[in-house]
Amino acid sequence: MDKEKLAKLQSQVRIGGKGTPRRKVVKKSVTSSQGDDRKLQAALKKLGVQPITGVEEVNMFKEDGNVLHFGAPRVQVHAALPSNTLAIYGPGQTKELTELVPGILNQLGPDSLANLRRLAESYQSLTARQAAAAAGSGGEGAGEAKEGEGDDEIPDLVDNFDEAEVKKSDLEELE
């Protein structure tokens, strides 16, 4: 070993005089998120917040039509009703309104319902334009294929209802 390396290592080993530890003690500092969390907890404690249990999800509707979604079970909600304060903990996700539609219809206010109608109209016009473009660019063959795809959603008639009605009346006469 070089004397330089040895001197460097020795200088790191002893950092003080007599009676001091020979190794450097690495102090673990409080991370900034823990420090912020402690400050937040202290501020909320001053407001007198109480935890609210049974919250499955929290949705905040933005003006641009998107939704800030906090999903369970990671959501913690604390409230101080006299000071009109709610604190929501957990990772939030920005989602489109259409992604959450079936589950949040009862949560929508008048503004959000207007946004939903606007989105539905734009979606309908978009699908109509796509169908027209496919029919126009593909010729008659593409149009027929498009009609066949649309028929998948509508069930085919199996029986004739007039004949079924006649059979039913015949059964009633026999009884």
Swiss-Prot record:
Belongs to the NAC-beta family. It comes from the Eukaryota. Residues 1-36, 129-175 are annotated as: Disordered. The keyword Cell inner membrane does not apply. This is Nascent polypeptide-associated complex subunit beta. InterPro entries: BTF3, NAC_A/B_dom_sf, Nas_poly-pep-assoc_cplx_dom. Part of the nascent polypeptide-associated complex (NAC), consisting of EGD2 and EGD1. NAC associates with ribosomes via EGD1. One of its GO terms (biological process) is protein transport. The keyword Flavoprotein does not apply. Residues 164-175 have a biased composition (Basic and acidic residues). It is found in: Cytoplasm; Nucleus. The lineage of its organism: Eukaryota, Fungi, Dikarya, Basidiomycota, Agaricomycotina.
